[in-house]
Amino acid sequence: ARKWAYTIKGVPDGQAEILVFEGNFHGRTTTIVGFSSEAKYRDGFGPFTPGFKLLPYGDADAVAAAMHPNVAAILVEPIQGESGIVVPPEGYLRRLRELADQHRVLLVVDEIQSGLGRTGKLFAFEHEGIRPDGVTIAKALAGGFYPVSAILAKAELMDVFTPGIHGSTFGGNPLACAVGIAALDVLIEEKLIERAAELGPHLDARLKAIRSPLVKETRSIGLWAGVELVPEAGGARKYCYALKDRGLLCKDTHVHTIRLAPPLVITRSQINEGLEIL
């Protein structure tokens, strides 16, 4: 994104800025953790790469106020997974797209957790009918069988890379690519995206029906949910351990939230069984 800003947009060298958001999680490289709003991810890894501005997630007005000629890109998760399945206000991504167009800024969407059917769409940004300039994907791209990641972007962005200036030792690994293609074939042929869209409302309704003084709120979209506990519950991790012993695998995140991400092949009866355990 910065190279695009210098070579295409004409931002003065060394002055490009990328807008990012509180509660973000984009990985664990030094540059990425440098703009995390979580101290535990940053501790012991500085000094960090400059040129990132941290803004409140879900607040499009804050993005509008942060715009200036040297902004290169907006990097955003359409739904924040690591923060506990935080869904932004309706229209948020559409407003970011409008602001990006208005100021000639790239809109880059991180779909590493939310993409490839998880929310009931191929990509979560489709819920708002937008088209980003760049999309990052991984995790489900190989169905959990092999490490593979990719970036999808418009030609104007990809063409700033010429042979020899950027790459990685195992980039284009043929085994990873073969596994990725097979996983995408399964996603389409077995209609797993449609399954997530069909079963998502059932999962949401069952979660909202939980009546417990320990539950602060539930949030879900497609087959992806967060159950946020009240502070008095003493944190989500001990409940995740207890649920594991009873046959339900889930993950704690941000201390108080139980995160559920069932496989897209799950059935309605299996959802019911899991929620009975919960």
Predicted regions: what is each one?
Residues 1-278:
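Conserved N-terminal phosphate-binding loop of PLP-dependent enzymes in the Aspartate aminotransferase
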